[in-house]
Amino acid sequence: MTTFADLDSTHLDAVVEINNAGYPAVPNTTRAELEQLAKVCSLAWVVLDDAGEVAGFVMAVNPGADYDSENYRYFESHYRNHLYIDRVVLGDSLRGQGVGTTLYAQVFEHAAQAGRDFVTCEVNLEPPNPGSLRFHHRQGFEDVSTQATKGGSVVVQLLAAPLGAVS
């Protein structure tokens, strides 16, 4: 049975490995960078597979955080009461099993309990990540804007889901 748990330091090496296996859909990162991100996050969960091994994760940031991300700054200026999903990656072994939908339902519940109005995120358009974009649309996310980041090397679709969008 797949379970969710709070991310802690014992999970970081596995999280870095899963994250970097998702490149270019998510940026490659180091353990130190993920440790810094975890300090900013209000929500950081791992997805554990049937054997109890880390097979995915999600990291999200509350409004008002001291976080220097081009995409987060966009949402801060347009959606003041939002939970921003900075990173979500599921390993190949979990794909197509409904785990992503279950994970997002939990994220939406967490955001609603915290009094948030929206859950926000971005998905790469360049380099393309069409599967993720389709998944997010199915979860109730709406396209709100696009922007070039990382000096123009990445173009993202900015997405927002009003709470209550997922049944």
Summary of predicted features, one role per range:
Residues 59-87, 151:
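Conserved acyl-donor/pantetheine-binding loop and adjacent beta-alpha core of acyl/acetyltransferases
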Residues 122-124, 137-156:
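Conserved catalytic-core motifs of GNAT/GCN5-like acyltransferases
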Residues 24-51, 59, 65:
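Active-site rim helix/loop that mediates acceptor-substrate recognition in acyltransferases
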Residues 1-15:
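A short beta-loop-alpha structural element at the N-terminal edge
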Residues 111-125:
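Conserved GNAT acetyl-CoA-binding A-motif
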Residues 77, 146-167:
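C-terminal "cap" of GNAT-fold acetyltransferases
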Residues 90, 96-109, 138:
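Conserved acetyl-CoA-binding loop-helix of GNAT-fold acetyltransferases
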Residues 76, 86-95, 124-125:
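A short, internal acetyl-CoA/4′-phosphopantetheine-binding micro-motif in the GNAT/acyltransferase core
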